[in-house]
């Protein structure tokens, strides 16, 4: 909503771990995660801002097939990403970090091992400037545009938490 973090909560655990927790344990862990969220995330000037430390932020809503728009910018040496349905991730990073392979650009499905993981092209704007993702997820298939350039075209997102199961 651009004013506060209504609709958001702290990341507790991957989907498989969450299912195994008792209601009481899940509630306790959620309270801890929400406290960490409040320490490191804030709504400011219509944007969600992260301190660069702490845990992930997740929506309270559940989505099936979806399209989303995300405006983002990253700092020098930054490394981040967007989890889709709790699975990592559409990669965001400083492309000058060649020692970790970041020269391939942002937008790839970084944790894919069997299939396509790198972007089709580098479409990142310079560090410290705004970039825009359009992400579509239909079933386990992901398409990503970065700054209106197609970087991932209908690729299956692999299940990072259990490589033998689909998303």
Spell out what each predicted region is.
Residues 1-167:
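Carbohydrate-interacting regions of secretory-pathway proteins
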């Amino acid at each position: 909503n651009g004013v506060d973090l209504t609709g958001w909560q702290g990341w507790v655990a991957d989907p498989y771990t969450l299912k195994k927790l008792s209601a009481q344990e899940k509630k306790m862990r959620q309270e801890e995660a929400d406290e960490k969220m409040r320490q490191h995330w804030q709504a400011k000037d219509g944007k969600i801002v992260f301190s660069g430390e702490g845990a992930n932020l997740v929506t309270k809503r559940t989505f099936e097939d979806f399209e989303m728009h995300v405006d983002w910018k990253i700092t020098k040496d930054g490394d981040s990403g967007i989890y889709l349905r709790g699975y990592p991730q559409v990669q965001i990073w400083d492309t000058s970090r060649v020692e970790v392979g970041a020269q391939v650009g942002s937008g790839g499905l970084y944790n894919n091992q069997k299939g396509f993981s790198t972007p089709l092209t580098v479409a990142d704007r310079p560090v410290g400037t705004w970039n825009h993702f359009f992400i579509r997820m239909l079933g386990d298939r992901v398409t990503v545009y970065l700054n209106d350039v197609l970087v991932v075209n209908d690729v299956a997102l692999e299940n990072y938490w259990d490589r033998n199961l689909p998303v």
